[in-house]
UniProtKB/Swiss-Prot annotation:
Gene symbol of the encoding locus: fliE
Coarse class of the protein's main subcellular location: other
GO molecular function terms attached to this record: cytoskeletal motor activity; structural molecule activity
Subcellular location: Bacterial flagellum basal body
A Pfam family this chain is assigned to: FliE
Organism name: Borreliella burgdorferi (strain ATCC 35210 / DSM 4680 / CIP 102532 / B31) (Borrelia burgdorferi)
Protein name: Flagellar hook-basal body complex protein FliE
Amino acid sequence: MVRTDAFFTENNINLVKKNPLHFDVNLFSSKSNAKDNDIKTFKDVLINSITDVNKSQLNVSKVTEQAILKPSSIDVHDVVIAMSKANMNLSILKAVVERGVKAYQDIINIR
């Protein structure tokens, strides 16, 4: 059975990747220099995800501007696909942040 182990240090939860097929932290990151047992904090993964969502939003702006200024240089479906990807990325990130906030509130309310 393959597991992803976690251990706690001060205020950080560190995750250890046990299998390269599971919990790929480079899924949203353009940097592929991670090794199999690299330790990434939740904060690092979240910040990388936010950065990638921002890049997808900026890509939509660029593609839309290109479609307006040079309509023959880009297909309409490429614009729609870029918008859909950015919307999906933002929706997923929003859901993760909301769940994280709810989990934090639940932990705080435990007495």
